[in-house]
Amino acid sequence: MDTGLDRSRAALIRLPLRYGLLLVPAVFLALFYFYPLVSILAVGLAPGGQPDLTGFAEIVTSAYYRHTLGFTLAQAALSTALTLLLALPGAYVFARYDFQAKSLLMALATLPFVLPTVVVAAAFSALVGPRGLVNEGLMSLLGLESPPVQLERTLAIILIVHVFYNYAVALRIIGSYWANQNPRMEEAARVLGAAGWRLPILRPALLAAGTLVFIFTFTSFGVVLILGGPRFATLEVEIYRQTANLLNLPMAAALSLVQIGLMLVMMAIYTRMQRRTAADVVSAASAVRPPRSRRARALVFGNLLFMAVMLFAPLLALVARSFTAGGEGFTTRYYELLFANVRGSVLFVPPMRAVGNSLVFALATTVLAVALGLITVYLLSQRGSRWANWLDPLFMLPLATSAVTLGFGYIIALDEPPLNLRASPVLIPLAHTLVAMPFVVRSVLPAKRSITPHLPEAARVLGASPWQVWRFIDLPLISRGLIVGAVFAFTVSMGEFGASLFIARPDTPTMPVVIFRLLGQPGAANYGQALAMSVLLMVVCAVGFILIERLRTVGMGEF
């Protein structure tokens, strides 16, 4: 018979286990997140071992760094305004109208957001670049000798790609909030004489979406680096240039600290705005209706046409150009070149080796992220735990830190004993795990918390061991969320670019790093190989995203 004494003994036995488990993700976070950030702080504030704020003073006094900071803020503000402006009609359509394939279109609209930046850069290069489909078509049609559409290395292409990336973010946040508002309030407002362009009810959602888009575009790296060229630099790009090109680590550290400070402010604003987007849910029948009028059908069709052109045309152009980049007609030559190590190539290994590297790193990342994520979920889901309230945001901190800052921290922190991992390929899956683990936690934690405590308690009363409770009760109930988290981890690792560009060795490059290097080299062969590898990476990410959407439980999970 189970007595209170027996339960007390069992609790005492589980206590060391719980704290022992806590040490595993805590040590991982301390070694591979906080230690690199503290190293950046030390280099930025005391580059020679003595307090020195010269780097910060130069940021304030130098016109170049003031311009870099100003451009970072300006392009983020412009990108945010354009994204909200273009996503608002689409959010209204998805919130108020019911039409065929609505769920599928929403899922497809989100696909660009999960694509690696190098793939998106290659896609827009294939569509509107000097050798893109648009310019080749216009040159052939009009008999021109030079490309008429000159968007490469302009602010316009940066803004367009930022809208491409973040359209789905605004569409989902504003659309879901709008769908939860009773349309009778709009009708009552019209009766009382309100104009159609007032948006007080949507203001929290607009501010939340705008803040999140601003954060994403403020930390833009791959888009500006690849498509903007040397003319443009965000803080992210400047940190990379100061480190990789100029070896000016104190200045890179100072810029990193400035960016971290600004990011903390923006994340605080976003968290506050997100809490204000809570709304009463109304029945779908009262808010959603078929587009019966001509005006409604035109609005739905116009938005779907815009989404097709804006979101899908670049991806289709990428696939088409990967077979026709050299102008000699349809060919699989560029896919075949991925298996060859061409003499004089910018790469040290055949490009296809990078596919194997990325797969190995992604598998290792998935195993590590799932293992650490499950331990974290177990700790955070303990009912009545006083630790959960502050451990939860602590383990999410890597999501609020840019990959470039993280990669820079690894360079200066992990290059000497006892953690001399700078030349080790192990560093890549460790960095990827740090970014991927929060996705596992957010995918599994809601499912674990939804398990009624009576189930495991009843199993223990009937004599089940902790392992049996986990194997036969917890695991089946969280399995869908666990698979979603694992696929997230795999996809995030495959497409990670910012940190990998810092820490990947020349003989073990990842797919995004190879694409970046090939895009930076002249010649049709390099360009064609970059497009071909981008297609392969896009397919992997698309398959992963489709699996996530199919396995995701409605209303369960936070991504």
Predicted regions and their residues:
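Transmembrane-helix boundary motif in ABC transporter permease subunits
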Residues: 2, 6, 78-109, 122, ...
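Membrane-interfacial helix termini and adjacent extracytoplasmic/periplasmic loops
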Residues: 5-11, 53-58, 66, 101-102, ...
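Periplasmic/extracellular loop-to-transmembrane helix junction in inner-membrane transport proteins
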Residues: 5-19, 42-81, 96-97, 145-148, ...
